[in-house]
Amino acid sequence: MAKEDVIEMQGTVLDTLPNTMFRVELENGHVVVAHISGKMRKNYIRILTGDKVTVEMTPYDLSKGRIVFRAR
């Protein structure tokens, strides 16, 4: 996926799912399922329910995403 093709949105983690998947509610009200990006996984970034995160989504499937940043 090319970097210019992604849609970045802010959201809040609603629920933790198996296999490091998370249910995230975006600012516009949509709920997506997102996984952790490789760099966050490598650096052991912990994500908990209620955290504010940045989610990257592809325009081809807007129901799935990748968590690329966790706000402090």
Swiss-Prot record:
Alphabetized UniProt keyword annotations: Cytoplasm, Initiation factor, Protein biosynthesis, RNA-binding, rRNA-binding
Broad class of the protein's primary localization: cytoplasm
Gene Ontology MF, one: translation initiation factor activity
One GO cellular component term: cytosol
Disulfide pattern: none
Matches recorded under Gene3D superfamilies: Nucleic acid-binding proteins
Limits of the S1-like domain: 1-72
Statement: the UniProt record of this protein carries the keyword Cytoplasm: yes
Signal peptide segment: none
Record localization: Cytoplasm
Assembly with partners or alone: Component of the 30S ribosomal translation pre-initiation complex which assembles on the 30S ribosome in the order IF-2 and IF-3, IF-1 and N-formylmethionyl-tRNA(fMet); mRNA recruitment can occur at any time during PIC assembly.
Similarity comment: Belongs to the IF-1 family.
Function of the protein: One of the essential components for the initiation of protein synthesis. Stabilizes the binding of IF-2 and IF-3 on the 30S subunit to which N-formylmethionyl-tRNA(fMet) subsequently binds. Helps modulate mRNA selection, yielding the 30S pre-initiation complex (PIC). Upon addition of the 50S ribosomal subunit IF-1, IF-2 and IF-3 are released leaving the mature 70S translation initiation complex.
Name of protein: Translation initiation factor IF-1
Organism name: Pseudoalteromonas translucida (strain TAC 125)
